[in-house]
Amino acid sequence: MTDYILNGVLGLAVGDALGQPAQGKTRESLKFSPVLEMRQGLWSDDTSLTLCTLASLRENDWRLDYHDLLRRFAKWLEYGYLTPEGVAFDIGATTKQALLNYLNGVPLECCAPRNEWNCGNGSLMRILPVEFYLQAQPAAGRYEIIRNVSALTHAHICCTLGCFLYCAVAGEIIQHRERFKLATL
């Protein structure tokens, strides 16, 4: 499992680092103004929040602690925890709203916005370590766990379903399934 964790998180971080300079730009704009240089060692919130999730699981003996997750996300926002330069940047509006709610004492289960205007990829980008946790858990209850982790910042059902499907595919890869059918997910 250690190889899957390392490979998964490194793959995510490399993809994040390579994609970050082009984030928010159209293909058309990149034709005229391509990314020609990249700063070394820079990653975005995608990697930082994934590392927060992984650190929480590892430091809690692979147990999920939703309060600890939100504390680490808030520490990232406020203090640049697990960032390459000690400063959080590139934070999505929905994630920021949920974390500010948490910092202002809103109960954990009420921090994230639930409307369709808050459907971003903020929970999807950090959910992979949860699949590593789920590998040692019974299949029943997978969706509820994934939903709970997603809903810390992104509570709309579209976000939680996206996370569930992503984890299902990652789980199939971890289980060495060469071909899998959507029906088995």
Question: What spans do the regions from the language model cover?
Answer:
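Structured, active/binding-site neighborhoods that engage oxygen-rich ligands
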Residues: 1-185
